[in-house]
Amino acid sequence: RDTSVTGVQTCALPIWQDRSSMTKLIVFDKDGVILDLEATWLNSAIAMTHFVSELTDGRHKPKAFQAIIGIDEETRQIDANGLFAAGSSADQFREFVRLEPALEPLLLHDAEIRRQIRSIFLETRNATLEAVGSVPNGDVKTPLKSLYKAGYQLAILTNDSEDSARQSCDDIGILPYFNMIVGFDSGFGSKPGPKGLIAICDEFNITPNEAAMVGDTYADFGAAKAAGAGLFIGISNIYPDCPDALKAAAHLLPDLSGLPSLLAKHAT
């Protein structure tokens, strides 16, 4: 494997093989790739677990629900393989119900409870934004601008909502670079399902093997593989403690800064 591009880590025995002849479309995950996941959403997730604990009348403490989704309120650590980092809210709720079956009618079927949870997430996020703003995952504007000017089609595929993703990108001044944004609520399901990535390819009239997926979790890797993407590029600054799926990626970068040069080299 070629690891001469600055920032590319070597991972043993990759199972992903590049299948693209020419990359025309680059599809990005949002949280953990474009935005700093901890700074943007951790407070919201913590608040949500406290609310769910209250729904059990305190039978289960917030810490129990935090453990299920892979976060720690005290240390502010996030499990890169956990449901908070990689799953959707539906995935998280299903696991909460496994712990406490009495939550099923509330979390899975009660529209008012789900509305309250969305409000908690957004209100806590807005408080975070007022305090620190949307926090990019390093310098993302420079590489995205470079890729945009190079003629690539750019899109976002996230397990967050489409509106939230659009707002976050607008907050940090990168929204004009993206031709399409797809969230879990855009009608194509969530990752690791392939429908969102396939829909983006269809929108631009290209085949999946002409697309590259850039992500930081098993959900991103799984979506790329299931859709038949030609290239997957992992983003993680914690190698070798990165998500297990990323260790199977053909390319692994610490952030987006090295992406333009990697793709330029890949095209030659």
Segments (PLM) and residue ranges:
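Conserved phosphate-coupling serine/threonine residues in phosphotransfer and NTP-handling enzymes
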Residues: 33, 158-160
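Single conserved hydrophobic/aromatic residue that forms the stacking wall/gate
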Residues: 1-15
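Residue-level "hotspot" positions that anchor or transmit function at local structural transition points
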Residues: 4-5, 84, 135, 188, ...
